[in-house]
Amino acid sequence: LIPIASLTGQPVTFTGRGRLMERPQSVYETLYREQNLRFEQSPAGLTVEGALTPGDYRLAGNVSSQFISGLLFALPLLPGDSTLHLIPPVESRSYIDMTRAVQAAFGVHSRWLDATTLLLPGGQQYRPCDYNVEGDYSQAAFPAVLGAVCGGVTITGLAPDTLQGDAAILDILRRCGAVFTRKGDSVTFAKA
């Protein structure tokens, strides 16, 4: 949300409870300082001010994909093209590609120029559409392990053609001896 808020050019303050405001934001802080934008984080909140501009952005490829996704959502809305250079290693490629797939469904496109550089054409707009959010393989891992041990568990909403890296849990469980069948987006475990 931070880069999206920076499309307004206005001061925006994010607040939260508990430890939420203690989460490290150094990735964005560095980026904002390079852009001469205001970025102030305190226990009371996080304030950003100033507008992102089209151009070249550099970000470590081994940071949380959430930082990369934030820029992917915002940069195509700027009036000019931007490039996002990810400094290797790029550790969350599947999550970056998931973000790009969702964007494409809503009419916003980007493309890989090479293994670490994305081109984000500017001047795009998100268009409304009907979209089915697929199940989360990471969250499904817990009941999947239960099913592998006890059997009698069916998990629905797990797209077989997903880009989620955590879908590997099914292969891991199969190699450990789990017995399951897949029918569409459902996975049913039998006791091994």
Predicted regions, residues:
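Short, structured segments at the rim of ligand-binding sites
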Residues: 2-192
